Every structure is written in structure tokens, then in C-alpha cells.
Design a protein with these regions (language model features):
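Active-site-proximal substrate-binding groove within the catalytic cores of carbohydrate-active enzymes
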Residues: 1-138
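Positively charged, low-complexity intrinsically disordered regions
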Residues: 73, 105-108, 144, 174, ...
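Short beta-strand/loop motifs in extracellular/secreted proteins, especially
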Residues: 126-128, 141-143, 175
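Generic detection of short hydrophobic beta-strand segments and adjacent strand-loop junctions
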Residues: 126-132, 154, 165-167
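C-terminal, active-site-flanking charged/polar segments
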Residues: 136-139, 148-150, 170-176
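Solvent-exposed beta-strand/loop surfaces of large extracellular or lumenal domains
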Residues: 143-164
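C-terminal beta-strand-rich structural cap/linker in extracellular carbohydrate-active enzymes
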Residues: 158-181
Length: 181
């Protein structure tokens, strides 16, 4: 996904998930949404086809209510955030670093809205401390940060030319932080 985002820059990318949807439990679908969020890649579900007892079986995700109703809450939660990331535009230089270092950070927005997508790929929940080059992003007066998935205010501390934001992240979970100017 990192390679796709780099090569496509700010163009949309939506992989076509072509699989046995009945073998994908809700936890697999949620994981797919979280992994896609950090790269602003819209999750999609193609028409699946697989061989069973010598016959091709076709599965259409969006024609089968047992799939799309099960995952509807994820679409409602993630798609508006993905659209905001897309509208802001991916920036190849994040001007941010994370502690612990295994937390992935991507920046969206060069002008108006500045968003940071975070992903904790570890097996344990953690508090990610993100240090942002506030001066280079014109965020030196920022005193407020909000998480878009959880809808919570998070600690935001100015430190000279930088800004420190602490965000709780579940294991294998993503979050997007909006900074106000």
C-alpha cells in the first residue's frame, strides 16, 4: 500500500478485494479498513469467484446483505474520514515523527486542513507521541487536536518550533488526527 500511495501521489486508489467473502470474518474486514486508512486507500470489494466441488461460485459482496449489513458501520465510520484525507491531499514529507517508532505516520494537507494518519502495527495498544515540525507547517499557535475516528480531543503541547500530540492507538488500529490552526 505504501508503494501504491507513493506512485499514485494524490490520485485515488482502490484495490479490488476478490476473495471468498464468507471466509472473511468481521475482524478481517475491520483490519482491512484500518490498514487502508493510513494510506487513504478506499477499501473495496470486487465480485468474488472461487472453485467449490469443481464448480465456480460467484459472490457479489454488495448484493448480499449478510456481508454489507455486517460491515455497514465500518463504511459509515471510515469513508467520511477517507474523503477528508483525499480532499486534503497526501504529502510525501510528513514533517512528523513518532514514538514509539513503529507507529506509521502519514500527513495529509499542505494548506488549510492538516491531518495526520497514524497506524499501530504492533500487537499491543500504545500511546503514540507524535512530534510535529509546527513552524514549517504554520502550526505554532495550534493548541487543539481531535481524533476523527474516535471523535475525541487529544493532548496537544507546543514545544518551541515543534508540537507534540499524544494519541492512544489500539493494537493493529489506525486513527486520524486533525490539527486546528
Amino acid at each position: 500500500m505504501a508503494r501504491a500511495r507513493t506512485l499514485l501521489r494524490n490520485k485515488p486508489y482502490s484495490p479490488l478485494m476478490n476473495t471468498r467473502f464468507d471466509s472473511m470474518g468481521p475482524e478481517v474486514v475491520e483490519d482491512y479498513f484500518h490498514k487502508s486508512l493510513v494510506w487513504d486507500i478506499f477499501p473495496s470489494f470486487f465480485n468474488g469467484a472461487y472453485m467449490q466441488d469443481g464448480e465456480w461460485v460467484r459472490v457479489h459482496y454488495f448484493q448480499d446483505p449478510k456481508f454489507y449489513n455486517r460491515d455497514r458501520h465500518l463504511f459509515r465510520q471510515f469513508i467520511p474520514v477517507l474523503r477528508r484525507l483525499f480532499d486534503a491531499g497526501w504529502q510525501p514529507v510528513t514533517r512528523a515523527r513518532s514514538q514509539p517508532r513503529q507507529v506509521r505516520v502519514e500527513r495529509y494537507g499542505a494548506g488549510g486542513e492538516v491531518l495526520f494518519a497514524l497506524y499501530n502495527g504492533s500487537a499491543s495498544p500504545l500511546d503514540a507521541r507524535i512530534t510535529i515540525e509546527a513552524e514549517s507547517l504554520d502550526l505554532t499557535h495550534t493548541r487543539e487536536a481531535t481524533t476523527l475516528l474516535a471523535g475525541a480531543k487529544v493532548a496537544c503541547r507546543p514545544d518551541g518550533k515543534s508540537l507534540e500530540v499524544t494519541v492512544p492507538l489500539g493494537a493493529g488500529k489506525a486513527e486520524v488526527v486533525q490539527l486546528s490552526r
